């Protein structure tokens, strides 16, 4: 069960009649470290979402890893739709805390929960679709970043194997983008 004290709270700005989320624990910690980020609405499970500029991604990922978020559970991408942005997302977990609990039972408080945070990098569809690779920080991002490149066209600077993972090398376009047009016919080029 999620502790209500760690879920960012929606507050109304009466001067501008807009709504803004109060920072969660991770966001407050990042602010204390001097790292620039954007507070986003928590997901349906109450997990804190943080918007990150591409230029800040590696610094924030390194800071979070040093703060215990040592496991990249998932990395991927999605398309917000026609005219929308492309998004590269990262789900980070404090797995070390859980591992310590299993090695030495009864070290966690009985009501402790799995600590997780989600990072999102928003990219303009017609802009620069390049994000720094997190491979040097989380080796598990290898194939996940390649799949995101293959399906959405988001390239990862500094990735050691920047090539398609699922589609043939000569494939045109990115199949999971909302503006993708399916070809009527594709003849695979066999490299003999």
Swiss-Prot record:
NDH is composed of at least 16 different subunits, 5 of which are encoded in the nucleus. The keyword NADP applies. Keywords: Membrane, NAD, NADP, Organellar chromatophore, Plastid, Plastoquinone, Quinone, Thylakoid, Translocase, Transport. It catalyses: a quinone + NADH + H(+) = a quinol + NAD(+). HAMAP family: NDH1_NuoC. GO terms for molecular function: NADH dehydrogenase (ubiquinone) activity; NADH:ubiquinone reductase (non-electrogenic) activity; quinone binding. One of its GO terms (cellular component) is organellar chromatophore thylakoid membrane. Belongs to the complex I 30 kDa subunit family. This is NAD(P)H-quinone oxidoreductase subunit J, organellar chromatophore. Its EC number is 7.1.1.-. It comes from the Eukaryota. Its main location: plastid. The keyword Phosphoprotein does not apply. It is found in: Plastid, Organellar chromatophore thylakoid membrane. NDH-1 shuttles electrons from NADH, via FMN and iron-sulfur (Fe-S) centers, to quinones in the respiratory chain. Couples the redox reaction to proton translocation (for every two electrons transferred, four hydrogen ions are translocated across the cytoplasmic membrane), and thus conserves the redox energy in a proton gradient. It is a peripheral membrane protein.
